[in-house]
């Protein structure tokens, strides 16, 4: 209803389209899960060291084509746009229901509720690109691998853990990637 196919390709396009009709685009910046999207395709990295206990992170790098400060500037530009709102999933859904939100970075767990509200205007697309250091950078999903959670109160918790381990083992991750 508010967004065209070309609008959803870039964060700039999303914000311009939403702003033109006084609406919001949302994303939860209080969560590292979501914030990773801005660092994932920049050449900056994080992970677990070989000791399996400590970690490394070079998101504050000062060398390379994309620096940590470049991402900071990109985030500030998005945050200062009146059409952007950083909010939790609960607040995102409230905005969907009251009509103030026209797009958001969220997960499949909200899809059925959004479809109920937006009906035929509902759509899901890949993450947009964003402007960083004068280039369009494709936003990334968190590390690009499959994760599974198991309900701790499951009647068959041991079997559920084994199934989750099998779905997410290295061999199956590679099959999914290929």
Briefly describe each language-model feature range.
Residues 2-7, 45, 153-160:
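Short helix-loop capping/hinge motifs at secondary-structure junctions, enriched
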Residues 9-13, 84-98:
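Short helix-initiation/N-cap motifs at beta->coil->alpha
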Residues 12-60, 101-103:
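Extracytoplasmic/periplasmic solute-binding protein
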Residues 15-20, 53-88:
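Glycine-centered hinge/linker elements that transmit conformational signals in sensory
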Residues 15-19, 36, 72-79, 93, ...:
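Non-transmembrane alpha-helical segments in soluble domains
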Residues 27, 87-88, 105-107:
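Short beta-strand and adjacent tight-turn residues that come in two discontinuous sequence segments
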Residues 102-107, 123-125:
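Paired acidic/hydrophobic, glycine-rich loop segments that form the ligand-binding mouth/hinge
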Residues 116-177:
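Extracytoplasmic/periplasmic substrate-recognition and gating elements
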């Amino acid at each position: 209803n508010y967004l065209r196919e070309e609008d959803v390709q870039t964060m700039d396009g999303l914000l311009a389209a939403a702003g033109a009709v006084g609406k919001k685009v949302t994303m939860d910046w209080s969560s590292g899960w979501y914030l990773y999207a801005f660092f994932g395709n920049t050449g900056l990295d994080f992970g677990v060291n070989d000791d399996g206990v400590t970690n490394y992170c070079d998101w504050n790098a000062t060398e390379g084509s994309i620096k940590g400060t470049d991402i900071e500037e990109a985030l500030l530009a998005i945050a200062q746009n009146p059409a952007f709102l950083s909010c939790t999933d609960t607040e995102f859904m409230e905005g969907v229901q009251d009509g103030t939100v026209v797009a958001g970075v969220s997960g499949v767990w909200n899809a059925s509720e959004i479809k109920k509200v937006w009906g035929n205007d509902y759509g899901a697309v890949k993450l947009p690109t964003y402007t960083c250091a004068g280039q369009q950078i494709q936003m990334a999903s968190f590390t690009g691998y499959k994760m599974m959670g198991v309900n701790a109160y499951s009647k068959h918790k041991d079997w559920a853990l084994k199934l989750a381990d099998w779905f997410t083992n290295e061999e199956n991750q590679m099959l999914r990637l290929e």
